[in-house]
């Protein structure tokens, strides 16, 4: 990573919930320790529903300025739960860009580890049906937790994992693997990771 860059204004990241908020805080710690003059200001929206995120944007008086983004799980938009996908399609042009995690934060977490781990998770997701159609949290979270236990030597997570946790401290290796595992048409995929990589280049 190139630390020779000018100090920049903070990026405002509207996080759909506790997990994303915790991640951005950990990312800031990592960047600060690396001496990189990049800051992400996180705001916790308390839920990833489109109406909720739209209201947060209105409250914060956000605009499309190249420095404000919304980080959200894609699962409820893909399933169109409560019309979220439909509303997003109609109104997205009037809001800051959405950076989707495919499908959810837990998928995103595993992108920070080896290709062997990511490949094993893809196989698990294919068996459960999560690969093609995102499962609801009540269905995928036990699968994810069991996967983490089976792969604890490779993951070195804090156990037991609960939603809202940032279960490991970011390192150079984690960030490099996140970028390496973030192929455009693969699963998992993170548009937030794409933004981070672009900023750090």
Go through each PLM region and give its residues:
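Conserved helicase/translocase motor-coupling segment
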Residues: 49-53
């Amino acid at each position: 990573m190139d630390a020779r860059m000018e100090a920049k204004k903070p990026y405002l990241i509207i996080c759909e919930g506790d997990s994303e908020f915790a991640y951005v805080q950990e990312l800031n710690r990592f960047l600060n320790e690396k001496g990189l003059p990049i800051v992400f200001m996180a705001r916790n929206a308390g839920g990833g529903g489109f109406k909720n995120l739209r209201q947060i944007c209105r409250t914060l008086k956000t605009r499309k300025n190249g420095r404000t983004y919304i980080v959200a799980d894609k699962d409820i938009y893909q399933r169109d739960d409560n019309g979220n996908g439909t509303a997003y399609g109609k109104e997205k042009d009037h809001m800051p860009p959405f950076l989707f995690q495919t499908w959810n934060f837990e998928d995103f977490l595993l992108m920070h580890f080896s290709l062997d781990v990511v490949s094993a998770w893809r196989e698990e997701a294919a068996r459960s049906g999560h690969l093609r159609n995102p499962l609801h949290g009540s269905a995928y979270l036990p699968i994810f937790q069991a996967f983490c236990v089976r792969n604890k030597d490779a993951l070195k997570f804090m156990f037991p994992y609960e939603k809202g946790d940032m279960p490991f401290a970011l390192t150079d290796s984690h960030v490099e693997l996140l970028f390496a595992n973030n192929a455009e048409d693969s699963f998992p995929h993170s548009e937030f990771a794409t933004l981070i990589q672009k900023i750090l280049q």
